[in-house]
């Protein structure tokens, strides 16, 4: 095996016609499957069909390794996440075992530490062989992502269609649950993960105290820090700072928190995640590296930008066999071209040397 420049005379060689040949993308945090499980409010879709549709969308975006982010603990009083959880786990496992999945699917357990049942459910699900990443979250109002109470009210009241009275009661309940459960659940979950050698991510750290706590627990990744202060401190403590690719494509955070481009500009952005929109992953990398874009002043070179969606996330999750075009690593590859506005077009995708798209 070899990785060379120049002409090839091998019988099976392909001319990519000037397109990019890139390592297959590695996605650490996507809840895209949930949209396929519930394509409309009140509509439950068969889980096997949902997983295959999600998988097709993932591969078409150039993602060859995906950590499906499944939430434990539903803050929505009318939500079905906890009921859907075992169905999603089973369907992902079956698709992976049967070879029907085109991407390499791993599991990312997102643990809402303020929920009363989270720790109990986590202890059961962490035994699943596909679990390789865990994050700890606390979405209670008045801190982290929702330091501004009006943003919390606007987001959840609109999302869950709550009346003013229901929203007031919801806020009181979430604050009380956070005070009662979060600290103990976070400590217990991290302890289990350390015993199993699983990478752990913090979520929405906003202050130096949050970051010191995360670093003290030995966390590897800082997901979506909400302030420049927290992102800088996370970087200094050796946590890989992860931000949303949609944040780059859209030009800012939908929650009004720090912009990913701002963190890129000061050199503390390490990993991008497609979060809720798979096609944003490669698009964001090309924007950060591209000419004639709003990110011209940042100008990551292409290898650095691509590493944020391939090699760096792979290593952060403990995967050392992928994320780079190098002899001895998996032949997870994609062919893509960039249109004039840095919009990528994925042409072909290979996983383990086999074409899957």
Identify the meaning behind each predicted range.
Residues 1-22:
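Histidine-rich, glycine-flanked metal-binding segment
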Residues 237-247, 251-336:
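His/Asp/Glu-enriched, well-ordered alpha-helical/loop segment
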Residues 128-132, 194, 213-221, 236-242, ...:
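Glycine-enriched alpha-helix->loop->beta-strand junction motifs that scaffold or abut catalytic
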Residues 1-2, 18, 62, 349-353:
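Glycine-centered positions in the ABC transporter ATPase nucleotide-binding domain
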